[in-house]
């Protein structure tokens, strides 16, 4: 509240994301949707008492579920054919004397900025976050096939509009009424208030408060929100089983094999587990359970190919992996380079990005008793470009 008056945040999330090629509000960045991140800006503002989220028709339940747990009551309503229509629907559902309208595709605004806009709106009737232009601004003829400069504007008079934009409810309602059907053409709410002849206060905005509009903005947002690298650790053991093939790192060795549902390639399994861990995808058993006949006797290199593909779906590629085998037998060093090549081929990377080494465990434990083989692995994943 401000001066005892309720303040309601309206999230404009009714668009289809046509310019970005995706429904921007549902895009997940850094483990959280853009909509939820933008809503958190308003929810974290002490002045805001509740939220109204305007979503595409039919997505009301999804919108409310997406914003659950933010600490403020949430109501979802259906949007209209244009932004101004959607905000009008949100305004009708808001029960505050002051409203803050915020783009659902601006997740980087601060709660402090929202508070300053709300305070100015309560005091002056209408306010918006904006940045003074720092570049020289040219005016050109709209829609010209070959754009040409008509004039150079005095950049001291030019401000670049952001959101939140705040209003006394009555001021915004009167602006909509004055505009009539032409309100749908407005690209922001302050334009309606200006057209109605009411003053609008400029509140200094934030340079990082950009709107996710196109693919370049998505990439910029990902770079800010998602870690460029991730690491995972894998561990696996298998006991020796006479009569089975012994496969390590995709290479067949002489001697008793290892017991397992697949080919029991403990080296590949540890690497796969490390990659799954780095990508936040659980473990090997979740994806390739020993109850599934599809994986019976299969080469573990095939599992690695599947795992690399699953990581790629999450936007990751394998940067490098390092595996240590603990085994009294067989001798690994003579065939380590061959193992590196096989593992790298399955992962779609260079052998230079794979390291294989071994230890005998100094004769201790089940390895020292030659009961089986263990493998420890670490994998580094790198965020894929684009």
UniProtKB/Swiss-Prot annotation:
Region (2-C-methyl-D-erythritol 4-phosphate cytidylyltransferase): 1-229
Region named 2-C-methyl-D-erythritol 2,4-cyclodiphosphate synthase: 230-386
A Pfam family recorded for this sequence: YgbB
Binding-site residues for a divalent metal cation, renumbered to this chain: 236, 238, 269
Listed GO biological process terms: isopentenyl diphosphate biosynthetic process, methylerythritol 4-phosphate pathway; terpenoid biosynthetic process
Catalytic activity: 2-C-methyl-D-erythritol 4-phosphate + CTP + H(+) = 4-CDP-2-C-methyl-D-erythritol + diphosphate; 4-CDP-2-C-methyl-D-erythritol 2-phosphate = 2-C-methyl-D-erythritol 2,4-cyclic diphosphate + CMP
Site (Positions MEP for the nucleophilic attack) residue list: 155, 211
Keyword Metal-binding: yes
Cofactor(s) it depends on: a divalent metal cation
UniProt keyword Transferase present: yes
Annotated GO MF terms: 2-C-methyl-D-erythritol 2,4-cyclodiphosphate synthase activity; 2-C-methyl-D-erythritol 4-phosphate cytidylyltransferase activity; metal ion binding
EC numbers, comma separated: 2.7.7.60, 4.6.1.12
Top-level taxon of the source organism: Bacteria
UniProt binding sites for 4-CDP-2-C-methyl-D-erythritol 2-phosphate: 236-238, 261-262, 283-285, 288-292, 359-362, 366, 369
Record key words, sorted: Isoprene biosynthesis, Lyase, Metal-binding, Multifunctional enzyme, Nucleotidyltransferase, Transferase
Chain positions of site Transition state stabilizer: 19, 24, 261, 360
Family: In the N-terminal section; belongs to the IspD/TarI cytidylyltransferase family. IspD subfamily.
Function statement: Bifunctional enzyme that catalyzes the formation of 4-diphosphocytidyl-2-C-methyl-D-erythritol from CTP and 2-C-methyl-D-erythritol 4-phosphate (MEP) (IspD), and catalyzes the conversion of 4-diphosphocytidyl-2-C-methyl-D-erythritol 2-phosphate (CDP-ME2P) to 2-C-methyl-D-erythritol 2,4-cyclodiphosphate (ME-CPP) with a corresponding release of cytidine 5-monophosphate (CMP) (IspF).
PANTHER family recorded: 2-C-METHYL-D-ERYTHRITOL 2,4-CYCLODIPHOSPHATE SYNTHASE, CHLOROPLASTIC
Name by which UniProt lists this protein: Bifunctional enzyme IspD/IspF
Organism: Anaeromyxobacter dehalogenans (strain 2CP-C)
Lineage: Bacteria, Pseudomonadati, Myxococcota, Myxococcia, Myxococcales
